[in-house]
Design a protein with these regions (language model features):
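Immediate post-signal peptide segment of exported/extracytoplasmic ligand-binding proteins
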Residues: 3-49, 69-70, 154-156, 210-220, ...
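Hinge/lid segment of periplasmic solute-binding proteins
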Residues: 13-41, 108-168, 260-263, 352-358, ...
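Long, aromatic- and glycine/proline-rich binding clefts that accommodate carbohydrate-like moieties
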Residues: 32-33, 46, 351-360, 409-473, ...
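Short, polar/charged alpha-helical segment
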Residues: 32-38, 55-73, 170, 174, ...
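Periplasmic solute-binding protein
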Residues: 63, 108-128, 144-191, 203, ...
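Extracytoplasmic "Venus flytrap"/periplasmic binding protein-like
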Residues: 63-143, 178-180, 184-186, 324-325, ...
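Extracytoplasmic/periplasmic substrate-recognition and gating elements
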Residues: 151, 299-305, 313, 323, ...
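Glycine-centered hinge/linker elements that transmit conformational signals in sensory
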Residues: 201-207, 244-308, 358
């Protein structure tokens, strides 16, 4: 490919696809000319990358790969597959020592794994040394909102954010605004129907719609939606910060320290245990409360079929128009719920629903993380040959470049750059997205965070969640019994990680002590509250947004 051909293609893409950008057309073209120039050594090379199948990555795989090839002459095979399969593929490449993919867009939930393994490229050093000649001068790392989530304990960057989405509270704003429903709720519960600030209010609202209202416009309605099938997706339902929402961990951002939302205690970077007996919080009163409430609401207030659903089957339900609220909802599905054909939007696709701050459990305290945020981030492995790694790094930077990123945001609604979030184009779209713009423009985006550095091997530990949570859902175990077994298994696996060895900061388990010793210490694990059911508290949607600041 000649530079002239690449420049002509770049002009076409800027004019016809990358119309929205925080850069001027001239600045966009200058950025693309840099890609054309540095791509010369990699002409006709085909690189392979893989990611999970959300809308943002579909756009990359089906549109941005073509743009990148047209402009640079580098071919890209961008596969999309299930999230757990992405992790499996990465693990396989590391274990075999054979290059399978040249780059991965993987969850930053693995940051504790990557930092300890010694198998992942440290991007901070890479862009200063062997990757310096292929690092975009206008990359502008300070513009990324999620770097604290992809940084190791050594202060080095191990992953570059490609997309982000949070897990927030979702509710039918139109129903909550109806005078008849507001009056009926207040007459029963003694306070206003509004955005719940705590789990007690969420439970009251769930009870109200499921058991008191029952039908709206002739349709049976429910005050809660969730899923409960014994399935790997049940793990995300809990590992994606359910325990932190209940208040099980310690204060600290992006994750609680020394005890995080997985209940794992860390001392001097070494995980020392998840069970209360070892100083962890995985079977603490707060964790048991979290599991008990999850099951109780699922059984009492959700549609009867929900308990047998996995995440995939449960996703479309709130769009069908008979769910009043959902405490655990990923903003990655915002675009899906703006379809004008759905009963949850008007004929123009304007939402009848809103997203708002997640209500807090009884053990939650100010200074703790408030919920979960997913960060899919570019990850390079050391066993990828340098020339292929460089070419993949070019593609990674292309899809997050300022030329491309705003257009990608408007397609996938998974923001990564401050400049895009504050752009006029994002402002114009705000009324279509039910609170997404307001969330990402607030400081709240720093309090909804991914799994952090306390988790030393995410792939090896993650299935513990769904295996043991399911014991409580099926009724074979109480919540306490299930969490006791889970904590014991987590400790066992931490010990196995220590035996297998890690390059640094491997687990060093505490010797077990009487649980009362740890429960009497400050912070997590926290002793059982005398009252886990404080009075319900709600606020208006407008006031709830102020909480984000």
């Amino acid at each position: 490919m000649t530079c002239a051909a690449g420049r002509k293609d770049a002009q076409w893409w800027i004019t016809n696809e990358f119309v929205e950008s925080t850069l001027s057309k001239e600045e966009q073209l200058n950025e693309m000319e840099w890609f054309i120039s540095v791509a010369k050594p990699f002409q006709n090379l085909t690189i392979r990358v893989v990611s999970e199948p959300i809308a943002t990555h579909w756009y990359e795989a089906n549109v941005l790969t073509k743009a990148f090839t047209d402009i640079t002459g580098i071919n890209v095979v961008h596969e999309t597959t299930a999230e757990d399969d992405v992790v499996t593929k990465m693990e396989t490449q590391i274990e075999l020592g054979v290059n399978i993919y040249d780059a991965y867009i993987g969850d930053s939930d693995l940051i504790g794994t990557h930092f300890r393994s010694g198998k992942v490229v440290n991007l901070t050093d890479f862009i200063k040394n062997e990757g310096k000649d292929v690092t975009l001068p206008s990359l502008d790392l300070d513009d990324f909102i999620g770097l604290s989530f992809t940084t190791g304990l050594d202060g080095k960057l191990y992953q570059l954010p490609d997309q982000q989405f949070a897990n927030l509270y979702w509710y039918r704003h139109d129903w909550f605004s109806r005078p008849d429903l507001k009056a009926k709720f207040k007459s029963i519960y003694g306070y206003e129907l509004g955005v719940p600030e705590n789990w007690s209010a969420y439970e009251d609202i769930a009870d109200f719609f499921t058991n008191k209202v029952k039908k709206i416009d002739g349709i049976t309605v429910y005050g809660h939606m969730d899923y409960g099938k014994k399935d790997p997706s049940l793990a995300w339902r809990f590992s994606d910060a359910w325990l932190s929402m209940a208040g099980a961990g310690d204060k600290g951002l992006p994750n609680g320290m020394p005890v995080d939302e997985w209940g794992i205690r860390v001392i001097d970077c070494h995980p020392v245990g998840a069970s209360v007996a070892r100083g962890g919080a995985l079977n603490s009163p707060a964790a048991v409360y979290a599991l008990r409430k999850y099951k109780e609401w699922l059984v009492k207030f959700a549609p009867p079929e929900a308990i047998n659903m996995d995440e995939r089957l449960s996703l479309p339900i709130i769009g069908q128009g008979n769910i009043a609220q959902q405490i655990f909802w990923y903003t990655a599905y915002t675009a899906i719920l703006t379809d004008p054909s759905l009963p949850v939007t008007d004929s123009d696709g304007i939402p009848k629903w809103r997203m708002a701050p997640s209500p807090k459990g009884a053990y939650w305290e100010p200074g703790m993380k408030m919920g979960y945020q997913d960060v899919g981030a570019w990850t390079l492995l050391k066993n990828t040959p340098l020339n292929r790694r460089k070419a993949a790094w070019l593609y990674a930077q292309f899809v997050v470049s300022k030329t491309v990123s705003l257009r990608k945001l408007l397609v996938g609604l998974t923001p990564i750059r401050k400049s895009d979030i504050n752009s006029e184009a994002f402002s114009k779209a705000a009324n279509r997205y039910g609170g997404l713009v307001e969330f990402y423009r607030s400081n709240a985006r720093n309090s909804w965070t991914p799994t952090g550095l306390n988790v030393p091997n995410y792939p090896f530990l993650s299935d513990v969640w769904w295996i043991y949570v399911s014991l409580a859902i099926t009724g074979t175990h109480s919540a306490q019994q299930a969490m006791n077994k889970m904590a014991q298994e987590m400790d066992n696996r931490l010990q196995q990680i220590a035996i297998n060895g890690q390059e640094r900061c491997e687990p060093r388990l505490n010797k077990p002590k009487d649980e009362n010793y740890w429960l009497s210490q400050p912070g997590a694990p926290k002793p059982k509250l005398s009252n886990e059911e404080p009075p319900g508290k709600t606020t208006s949607y407008e006031e709830s947004l102020k909480a984000w600041d």
